[in-house]
Amino acid sequence: GDVYKRQVWFDSGSTFQHVLRGSHKDAYDRAPFHDAGPEADLYLEGHDQHRGWFHSSLLLGCALYDRAPYKGLLTHGFATDGQGRKMSKSLGNVVAPQEITDKMGAEIVRLWVASTDYSGDLNIDDKILARVVDAYRRIRNTLRFLLANVSDFDPAQDAVSDADLLEIDRFALSRAAQMHADILAHFKVYEFHPVVSKLQIYCSEDLGAFYLDVLKDRLYTNAPKSLARRSAQTVLYRITHAMLRLMAPFLSFTAEEAWQAFGSSESIFMETYSDLGTPNEALLAKWTRIREIRDQVNKDIETLRADGKVGASLQASVNLQVGPEDHALLASLGNDLKFVFITSHIILEAGSEILAKVSVSQDTKCERCWHYAPDVGVVPATLALGVLAHRNLGKHFG
């Protein structure tokens, strides 16, 4: 009799017919597009499937329904060693996912995948994994700081309205909203490695190297229920909410672990993304410039530190000359300028360009607040006195 031949990819190419009209039939029947034929949201496989599963699915979909059986198609490369070579036992360069999981945990495997550009091959070796571990620790340590500093914060009773937030806190919220919008835009088009990169930079530079560093005085030395401290906690609480939701797709265990200590619902995976509002562009521009000037001053302070003349920036005294526009910008901070620059003394002067003269403070260090001041030893230093009396300390960002 006649011999019929069937292309070997026919079975897999018809999976949309079996899945969307079989095991997932109830969901398919409720979908508004079901009359036009089954259609998956996404087909995901390696780039070798352009001639295999993707191709046979497209042929069958067009033959049966005059269209592709998927809305989107995502292809990825293959895992190679650190030098981009194909893994083989003869080369001794095989990296087994289970071994990484046993040694470092599943989070590291997930983070490696998410942080790698999957449009090409995905390189992996011990050095690459060490960098992934370092990135994970940076994100986790940031979370630990955030959780610790909102542990006594009840949003129902303690939250400060947006209008009453201190300016630097409003800036931090705008920067978080900007980061949040950028990351969601990447998620929508399945770009995961920029998500990890931007979240890591946000944790290390925006939070660790600036905002959280500046906040420590306010969080640790202001009265517990003061406006200044509650303003900071309000923003930290909202940042934590947003970060956990953004992390959950690729740092699932970590996000869930933190959520169990922080969240109000059963699981982070029952939550939707946060709404941080629209970034304030004027505020972002102002504080971006302040941070640029601060970075330049910090370089001069680091020179003193490298020479062993100061141990911390609070031991430095700064005379700062800046141009007219920058002078107006920094002068608007008043006495808070020294807290932004994390120095015990800073004198602002008009000039034509940025010029910082950094010297060692001749005052005495307060053992409670660590600031250097002339009144240490006479009475408790001003900052420490505010703590002992459980009072607000004047302006200090509020």
Report residues per predicted region.
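Active-site catalytic microenvironments for nucleophilic, acid-base chemistry
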Residues: L60-L64, A261, N392
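Conserved NTP-handling cores and scaffolds of large molecular machines
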Residues: L143, V150, R294-V297, L304-G308, ...
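Structured secondary-structure scaffolds
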Residues: G1-D152, A172-L215, T234-A248, K365-R368
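Acidic, turn-prone loop/beta-hairpin segments
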Residues: F153-A185, L212-P324, I347-K357, L383-A384
